[in-house]
UniProtKB/Swiss-Prot annotation:
Gene3D superfamilies: 3.30.390.30, FAD/NAD(P)-binding domain (3.50.50.60). It comes from Bos taurus (Bovine). The thioredoxin reductase active site is a redox-active disulfide bond. The selenocysteine residue is also essential for catalytic activity. It catalyses: [thioredoxin]-dithiol + NADP(+) = [thioredoxin]-disulfide + NADPH + H(+); H2O2 + NADPH + H(+) = NADP(+) + 2 H2O. This is Thioredoxin reductase 1, cytoplasmic. The modification N6-succinyllysine is found at residue 68. There is a cross-link at residues 497-498 (Cysteinyl-selenocysteine (Cys-Sec)). Its cofactor is FAD. Transmembrane segments: none annotated. InterPro entries: FAD/NAD-bd_sf, FAD/NAD-binding_dom, FAD/NAD-linked_Rdtase_dimer_sf, GSHR/TRXR-like, Pyr_nuc-diS_OxRdtase, Pyr_nucl-diS_OxRdtase_dimer, Pyr_OxRdtase_I_AS, Thioredoxin/glutathione_Rdtase. One of its GO terms (cellular component) is nucleoplasm. Belongs to the class-I pyridine nucleotide-disulfide oxidoreductase family.
Length: 499
């Protein structure tokens, strides 16, 4: 008997990953530890303006990394102003150089892109700068930027394609507007800017653009920071407004026209009210769209292998083990239905998936109590449930909210932003006042939130917070002295850093 004819054809790879972002790269490197043959396909479709970038995905190239660096540029401007009150004779004529900042940011990103390629090579992961598209069971077509096609087969596939910014679908949006994909490498200062949207991307970009001295307006359709705690969102909006950012509420653009070409040029934006027939128009140098993001799942041949997606959102439903309805195809990151769109979540999910597939692990990604930070001028860190979600889940009578304003010591000398920083914990009364939501608005909110996130994972209660001795004088100590409940209506204003 000739057994060789009955053996299935071997696959080219054990695992092919579509998408070279944070999640895909984490999964690739982890799978390679188990001596698996792994390939990563990554391709950046240029923006309407032609912007493209290297390996690493959104976070590294057009997301968290450049955003935090530009946020830092804005904070340094504030620090320069504060420094005069501390005895530094800073000349009044300090100016910001956009080109110098973007060059420095892009140089750093370039070094990260190179580092990822080196890491893949060292781990013997095959990387191709090519667009992946399923063509049949266990088979994928890879098309490079010259249009050359190759077919590869694999035992398993991981979809980690991420999301891209959404456009409005109005006259002039793709011709004249930019998105966050373009902003961080924009070769000229954007000048007077209209930011369209109320997402965290919109508010973060508006914040640092205003922080480096630009005239910024934010056009909002309805509420700020949908999905986040609305009490915190409104406090962020108020602070931004007090610091010179203008808000146009309940309006949406219906047309963008070019008045004059240039770098930047001049644009006319016509907008319509969401609750009447009123239209308004304004003139800006740059229009930045930040109205949301869409999953990159519709043009990768999922219909050729039977992977189900949510037709409305493009998101992929998966099991607790990130498995799609097709057993050999998995998905992680921003494209998952009902999961958090955060880089560290994708990284964790990618690593754990590889460990389950190849290392005998049974540990699944925990999507509960994930900390996050919005890097607005006044940073907002949170972990767990918003106040609204807690009330919805446990009932208003079973939720106790402890809160307080606070004033960072460093801000008392320049006498700025008194009673703007705010701390809040949301507790479940029925469960020994377990802390189910943690919220802080203030400097270094991400650094503050990270440690408390570990405590929430361990089942932190209000009693445990109260019995913790604070570090003095720091912002985070406010969480060890919260005594006023929201329902009491008691005074939460602070007169100094020591309460």
């Amino acid at each position: 008997m000739n057994g060789s004819k009955d053996l299935p054809e071997p696959y080219d790879y054990d695992l092919i990953i579509i998408g070279g972002g944070s999640g895909g790269l984490a999964a690739a490197k982890e799978a390679a530890k188990y001596d698996k043959k792994v390939m990563v396909l990554d391709f950046v479709t240029p923006t309407p303006l032609g912007t493209r970038w290297g390996l690493g995905g959104t976070c590294v190239n057009v997301g968290c990394i450049p955003k935090k660096l530009m946020h830092q540029a804005a904070l340094l401007g504030q620090a320069l102003r504060d420094s005069r009150n501390y005895g530094w004779n800073v000349e009044e004529t300090v100016k910001h150089d956009w080109e110098r900042m973007t060059e420095a940011v892009q140089n750093h990103i370039g070094s990260l892109n190179w580092g990822y390629r080196v890491a893949l090579r060292e781990k013997k992961v095959t990387y191709e700068n090519a667009y992946g598209e399923f063509v049949g069971p266990h088979r994928i077509k890879a098309t490079n930027n010259k249009g050359k096609e190759k077919i590869y087969s694999a035992e398993r596939f991981l979809i980690a394609t991420g999301e891209r910014p959404r456009y409005l679908g109005i006259p002039g949006d793709k011709e004249y507007c930019i998105s966050s994909d373009d902003l961080f490498s924009l070769p000229y200062c954007p000048g007077k800017t209209l930011v369209v949207g109320a997402s965290y991307v919109a508010l973060e970009c508006a914040g640092f653009l205003a922080g480096i001295g630009l005239d910024v307006t934010v056009m909002v359709r309805s509420i700020l920071l949908r999905g986040f705690d609305q009490d915190m969102a409104n406090k962020i909006g108020e602070h931004m407004q007090e610091h010179g950012i203008k808000f146009i509420r309940q309006f949406v653009p219906i047309k963008v026209e070019q008045i004059e070409a240039g770098t930047p040029g001049r644009l006319r934006v016509i907008a319509k009210s969401t609750d009447s027939d009123q239209t308004i128009e304004g003139e800006y140098n740059t229009v930045l769209l930040a109205i949301g993001r869409d999953a990159c799942t519709r043009k990768i041949g999922l219909e050729n292998v039977g992977v189900k997606i949510n037709e409305k959102t493009g998101k992929i439903p998966v099991t607790e083990e990130e498995q799609t309805n097709v057993p050999y195809i998995y998905a992680i990151g921003d494209i998952l239905e009902g999961k958090l769109e955060l880089t560290p979540v994708a990284i964790q999910a990618g690593r754990l998936l590889a460990q389950r597939l190849y290392g005998g692990s049974t540990v699944k990604c925990d999507y509960e109590n994930v900390p996050t930070t919005v890097f607005t001028p006044l940073e907002y860190g949170s972990c767990g449930l918003s106040e609204e979600k807690a009330v919805e889940k446990f009932g208003e009578e079973n939720v106790e909210v402890y809160h307080s304003y606070f004033w960072p010591l460093e801000w008392t000398i320049p006498s700025r932003d008194n009673n703007k920083c705010y701390a809040k914990v949301v507790c479940n009364i029925k469960d020994n006042e377990r802390v189910v939501g943690f919220h802080v608005l203030g400097p270094n909110a991400g650094e503050v939130t990270q440690g408390f996130a570990a405590a929430l994972k361990c089942g932190l209660t209000k009693d445990q917070l109260d019995s913790t001795i604070g570090i003095h004088p720091v912002c985070a100590e406010v969480f060890t002295t919260l005594s006023v409940t929201k329902r009491s209506g008691g005074n939460i204003l602070q007169t100094g850093c020591u309460g």
